[in-house]
C-alpha cells in the first residue's frame, strides 16, 4: 500500500480538508510557468513537513500534476518526488540532517549522465501558513509564532489558526538536463543547486510577506531625526515665530496624518470581504502580466504601481489581485478626501497613506511627506499612486500630475540602493459604478463630497457588472530611464547634491508621458468597449445584428493579426459571442421584427457608453483614420495614406497617449489587412470593394469627432497663423460647442477645455504656433482634415471660423 493510501495519510488529508483552504500561485502553473507535462517532474521544498506535503498533494491533484507521494521512476531508478533542503524540526533537539536530500540531487543528475534524452524538471514549491511579515524588533513574538522553521507543535497551531490562509506557490522549473550539460553531474553541482534553492526560497518569502513592519511611533521618531525634517522644523519655527518644540509637534501631526498603519489581520479580514464582493459584482477578473511583476519583486526591485484611475474600486482591486498573485498589497497614496470615518482608518490599516491635493507653500509638510516616501522605498515596501491625480470622467487617460513621479525620481537621485521600477497598470471594467455620476459632473452638477453613505449606496446597488480587467504594462526601471535620458546624471548629482538639476523637470515630464503611454499600451478590449465603439459610430447608435457581428469580427481580426502591443489583451470568441455578452450585461438592447434583430444603445445611456468606448479608442483610431482616407480621397495610394497618418499621428499621440514606434510601418500593415480581408482592392491605388463600403464607413466613424476637433484647430490657424495659445484654446472650444449644438455631438470629451489645451501645446511643439513659416504645412493639414469630414460638418466649421474672425 502506498503512503497516500495509508490510514495515517487519509486521516491527515481529512483533517486538512476541514481546516485548510489553499490558494495556488500562479493559478495556472502550466501556462504561467511553462511547465512541460510530457517531462518528468520533481518538487523542491525548503523544509520537510508532513502537513506541507499533504497540502501540496491536494493542489497537485486539482492541477493534474504528479502527486508528491508517488516516487519518480526513470531508467529503472527510483527517487522521491519531493526533495527537501532541510529535515523536519523536532519539538526538542536538533533538526534532522538534510544530507540524504543532497544525495537525491546527485542521483537525479547522474541519471542524466546515463540518458542523454532525459530532462527532469525541478519545480521549487513554497508553502505559507498566513503571510504576516512580523514587526521590527519584535523578537518575543517571532520566537512564539515562528513560521519559517516551526516545530510540529507550532505547525499544528498554525494550521489551526491560519489554515484558511494557506498559499502554495510554484516557481519556474529548472532543467536538470541543462544543468548536467552545462555544469556537470558531480557533488559540487548538487551543492550549488541546494544553495541556489535556499536563496530562492528566502527571496520568495519576502515577495509573499513583504519586509517587516516598523512600529509606528518608532518610525515617526526616526523620521523626525532626519536631516531634511530637522532643517524644515527649524525653518518652520523661524518663519512662523514659534518654538522648535511646537514646530516638531506640527511635524508629528503631519506624519500621523500621512502615514499608513498596515495591519496583516485587517488585510486577512478584508480578503474575505473582497472575495465576497468580487464574486457578487463580477463574473471574473482577467489578469495579464502578473508573472513579470512577481519576477521583478523576486529580483529585488522596489516596485511602484502607477495605474490609471477609473473608480474608487481601483484601490481595492489592485490590492486584492496582488494578494492573490502572491505579492504584498502596496502602500497606496490616497487623496486626503478619502480620510473620512470609518473608511479612512480602514484604508490606513490596509496600507493607504494620505496625501494633500497641494503642498504649495508648506515646506514642513513637503519635507515630512518626502521623507516618509523615501522611507517606504528604503525599507522595500511597494507603493502605488495614481498619476492622473483623480478619476477620469470621460474614460480617456487624463494628463498626468507629475508631483509623485518627481518625488519618486528624487528618491532615486538621493541614493535609493535598490532598483526602483514603475509598473504601469491598466484597469478596465464592464461597468463602472460612478459613470452616471461622472456625466452629471461634466454637465455642471457639483461634485459630492465623499462619505460613508456613498459607499453604502453603491453596495446597495450591487449587481451583475460583468468582468474586471487588470493588465500590467511594460515596467520602467528608473536607473535605466535616467541612463538613457541623462547619461551623466550621476556626475551632475555628485557635484552638487543640493542643487536641482536643470534636466530634472524635462525628465519628469518625459517619464510621466511614458507612464501614460505604457498604461494605454496594456489596454484590455472587452465586449462592452468594442461594442460601444461600433454602435456609437453608427448613425442612430443601432445596427442589424448580423452587421454588428460582422463589424466586431473585423475589429477582432485587426487587433489579433496586428497586436497593438504585446501587453494588450483581446477577448476570445467571435463577434457573435461579444454581442451576446453585451445583451447579457444589458449594455445594449435588442428589437426584433420580421426582417431580423436590431441591436442598439438606448438613448438614455448613449452618453454613458462613450466612457467605455474611450477606454480603447486609441487601439483603432489609426485604422479608422485610414478608412476615412480610403473612402473620401479619390484614387488613394499608399503614399497618400502614409502622408495623412504622418500629419495627424503627432496630435493623436498627444491626445491619446499612443506609443506606435513607426507609424508608416503600422499604416502599411493595416492596409495589408484591409486588402487581405477584401475591404479594398489595390492596383496602383486603392478601390473600396462595393460590398464592404458599410464596414469601412462604420470604421471611419470612430475618428469623426476627433477629426472635427483637428479641423477646427487648423481652420482657425489657417485664417490667423499667429494666434496665441490661449486665444486658440478659447476660440476652438467655442466653435466646438457650436458644432456640437448644430450636429448633435454629445461626447463629453468633445467640449473638454483641457483637451484643447493639450492639443495647443502639441501644436506649439510641432512649430505650428511659432511663426508664419509653417503656413504651408497648416494649409495642407487643414485641407486634409476638411477632406475627411462630412460636407455638412465641414461647411459649419468653415462658416463658423469666418464668422469668428469677422467678430
Curated annotation (Swiss-Prot):
Topological relation to the membrane, as annotated: Peripheral membrane protein
Catalytically driven reaction(s): sn-glycerol 3-phosphate + an acyl-CoA = a 1-acyl-sn-glycero-3-phosphate + CoA
Matches recorded under SUPFAM superfamilies: Glycerol-3-phosphate (1)-acyltransferase (SSF69593)
Keywords: Acyltransferase, Cell inner membrane, Cell membrane, Lipid biosynthesis, Lipid metabolism, Membrane, Phospholipid biosynthesis, Phospholipid metabolism, Transferase
Disulfide bridge positions per record: none
Coiled-coil residues: none
Motif extent (HXXXXD motif): 308-313
Keyword Nucleotide-binding set for record: no
Secretion signal, residue range per the UniProt entry: none
SMART domains (UniProt xref): PlsC
Entry keyword annotation includes Lipid metabolism: yes
Pathway named in the protein's UniProt entry: Phospholipid metabolism; CDP-diacylglycerol biosynthesis; CDP-diacylglycerol from sn-glycerol 3-phosphate: step 1/3
Annotated EC: 2.3.1.15
One term under GO cellular component: plasma membrane
Class of this enzyme: transferase
Primary subcellular site in the record, as a coarse category: membrane
Protein's cellular compartments: Cell inner membrane
InterPro entries xrefs: GPAT/DHAPAT (IPR022284), GPAT/DHAPAT_C (IPR045520), GPAT/DHAPAT_LPLAT (IPR041728), GPAT_PlsB (IPR028354), Plipid/glycerol_acylTrfase (IPR002123)
GO BP: CDP-diacylglycerol biosynthetic process; fatty acid metabolic process
Any GO MF annotation of the entry: glycerol-3-phosphate O-acyltransferase activity
Domain comment, as recorded: The HXXXXD motif is essential for acyltransferase activity and may constitute the binding site for the phosphate moiety of the glycerol-3-phosphate.
Similarity remark: Belongs to the GPAT/DAPAT family.
PANTHER family per record: DIHYDROXYACETONE PHOSPHATE ACYLTRANSFERASE, GLYCEROL-3-PHOSPHATE ACYLTRANSFERASE
Protein name: Glycerol-3-phosphate acyltransferase
Gene that this sequence comes from: plsB
Amino acid at each position: 500500500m502506498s503512503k497516500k493510501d495509508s490510514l495515517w495519510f487519509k486521516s491527515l488529508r481529512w483533517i486538512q480538508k476541514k481546516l485548510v483552504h489553499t490558494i495556488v500561485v500562479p493559478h495556472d502553473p502550466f501556462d504561467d510557468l511553462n511547465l512541460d507535462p510530457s517531462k518528468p517532474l520533481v518538487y523542491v521544498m525548503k523544509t520537510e513537513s508532513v502537513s506541507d506535503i499533504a497540502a501540496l498533494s491536494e493542489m497537485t491533484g486539482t492541477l493534474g500534476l504528479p502527486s508528491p507521494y508517488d516516487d519518480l521512476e526513470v531508467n529503472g531508478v527510483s527517487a522521491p518526488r519531493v526533495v527537501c533542503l532541510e529535515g523536519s524540526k523536532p519539538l526538542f533537539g536538533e533538526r534532522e540532517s538534510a544530507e540524504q536530500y543532497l544525495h537525491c540531487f546527485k542521483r537525479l543528475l547522474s541519471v542524466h549522465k546515463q540518458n542523454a534524452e532525459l530532462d527532469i524538471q525541478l519545480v521549487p514549491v513554497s508553502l505559507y501558513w498566513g503571510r504576516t511579515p512580523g514587526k521590527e524588533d519584535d523578537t518575543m513574538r517571532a520566537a512564539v509564532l515562528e513560521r519559517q522553521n516551526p516545530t510540529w507543535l507550532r505547525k499544528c497551531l498554525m494550521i489551526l489558526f491560519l489554515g484558511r490562509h494557506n498559499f502554495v506557490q510554484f516557481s519556474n522549473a529548472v532543467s536538470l538536463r541543462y544543468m548536467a550539460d552545462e555544469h556537470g553531474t558531480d557533488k559540487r553541482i548538487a551543492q550549488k543547486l541546494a544553495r541556489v534553492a535556499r536563496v530562492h526560497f528566502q527571496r520568495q518569502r519576502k515577495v509573499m510577506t513583504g519586509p517587516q513592519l516598523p512600529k509606528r511611533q518608532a518610525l515617526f521618531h526616526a523620521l523626525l531625526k532626519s536631516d531634511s525634517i530637522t532643517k524644515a522644523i527649524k525653518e518652520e519655527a523661524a518663519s512662523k515665530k514659534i518654538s522648535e518644540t511646537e514646530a516638531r509637534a506640527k511635524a508629528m501631526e503631519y506624519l500621523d496624518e500621512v502615514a499608513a498603519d498596515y495591519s496583516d489581520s485587517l488585510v486577512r479580514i478584508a480578503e474575505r470581504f473582497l472575495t465576497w464582493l468580487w464574486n457578487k459584482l463580477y463574473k471574473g477578473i482577467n489578469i495579464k502580466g502578473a508573472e513579470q511583476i512577481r519576477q521583478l519583486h523576486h529580483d529585488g526591485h522596489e516596485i511602484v504601481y502607477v495605474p490609471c484611475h477609473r473608480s474608487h474600486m481601483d484601490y481595492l482591486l489592485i490590492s486584492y489581485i496582488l494578494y492573490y498573485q502572491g505579492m504584498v498589497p502596496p502602500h497606496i497614496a490616497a487623496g486626503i478626501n478619502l480620510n473620512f470615518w470609518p473608511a479612512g482608518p480602514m484604508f490606513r490599516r490596509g496600507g493607504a497613506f494620505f496625501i494633500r491635493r497641494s503642498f504649495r507653500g508648506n515646506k514642513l509638510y513637503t519635507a515630512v511627506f518626502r521623507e516618509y516616501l523615501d522611507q517606504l522605498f528604503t525599507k522595500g515596501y511597494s507603493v502605488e499612486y495614481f498619476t492622473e491625480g483623480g478619476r477620469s470622467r470621460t474614460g480617456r487617460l487624463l494628463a498626468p500630475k507629475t508631483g509623485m513621479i518627481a518625488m519618486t525620481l528624487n528618491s532615486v537621485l538621493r541614493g535609493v540602493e535598490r532598483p526602483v521600477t514603475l509598473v504601469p497598470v491598466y484597469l478596465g471594467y464592464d461597468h463602472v459604478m460612478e459613470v452616471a455620476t461622472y456625466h452629471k459632473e461634466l454637465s455642471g452638477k457639483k461634485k459630492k463630497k465623499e462619505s460613508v453613505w456613498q459607499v453604502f449606496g453603491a453596495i446597495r446597488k450591487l449587481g451583475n457588472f460583468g468582468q474586471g480587467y487588470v493588465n500590467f504594462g511594460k515596467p520602467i526601471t528608473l536607473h535605466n530611464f535616467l541612463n538613457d535620458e541623462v547619461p551623466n546624471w550621476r556626475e551632475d548629482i555628485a557635484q552638487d547634491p543640493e542643487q536641482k538639476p536643470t534636466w530634472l523637470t524635462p525628465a519628469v515630464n518625459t517619464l510621466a508621458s511614458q507612464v501614460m503611454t505604457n498604461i494605454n499600451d496594456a489596454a484590455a478590449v472587452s465586449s462592452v468597449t468594442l461594442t460601444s465603439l461600433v454602435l456609437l459610430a453608427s448613425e442612430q447608435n443601432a445596427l442589424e445584428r448580423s452587421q454588428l457581428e460582422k463589424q466586431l469580427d473585423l475589429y477582432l481580426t485587426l487587433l489579433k493579426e496586428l497586436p497593438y502591443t504585446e501587453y494588450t489583451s483581446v477577448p476570445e470568441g467571435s463577434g457573435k459571442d461579444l454581442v451576446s455578452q453585451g445583451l447579457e450585461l444589458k449594455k445594449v438592447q435588442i428589437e426584433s421584427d420580421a426582417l431580423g434583430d436590431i441591436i442598439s444603445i438606448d438613448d438614455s445611456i448613449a452618453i454613458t457608453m462613450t466612457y467605455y468606448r474611450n477606454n480603447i479608442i486609441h487601439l483603432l483610431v489609426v485604422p479608422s483614420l485610414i478608412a476615412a482616407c480610403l473612402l473620401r480621397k479619390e484614387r488613394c495610394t499608399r503614399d497618400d495614406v502614409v502622408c495623412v497618418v504622418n500629419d495627424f499621428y503627432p496630435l493623436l499621440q498627444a491626445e491619446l497617449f499612443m506609443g506606435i514606434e513607426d507609424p508608416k510601418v503600422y499604416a502599411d500593415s493595416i492596409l495589408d489587412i484591409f486588402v487581405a480581408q477584401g475591404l479594398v482592392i489595390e492596383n496602383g491605388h486603392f478601390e473600396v470593394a462595393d460590398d464592404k463600403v458599410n464596414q469601412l464607413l462604420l470604421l471611419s466613424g470612430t475618428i469623426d469627432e476627433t477629426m472635427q476637433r483637428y479641423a477646427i484647430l487648423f481652420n482657425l490657424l489657417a485664417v490667423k497663423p499667429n494666434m496665441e495659445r490661449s486665444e486658440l484654446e478659447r476660440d476652438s472650444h467655442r466653435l466646438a460647442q457650436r458644432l456640437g449644438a448644430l450636429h448633435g455631438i454629445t461626447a463629453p470629451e468633445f467640449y473638454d477645455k483641457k483637451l484643447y489645451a493639450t492639443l495647443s501645446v502639441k501644436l506649439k511643439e510641432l512649430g505650428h504656433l511659432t511663426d508664419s513659416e509653417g503656413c504651408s504645412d497648416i494649409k495642407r493639414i487643414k485641407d486634409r482634415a476638411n477632406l475627411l469630414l462630412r460636407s455638412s460638418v465641414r461647411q459649419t466649421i468653415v462658416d463658423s471660423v469666418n464668422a469668428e474672425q469677422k467678430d
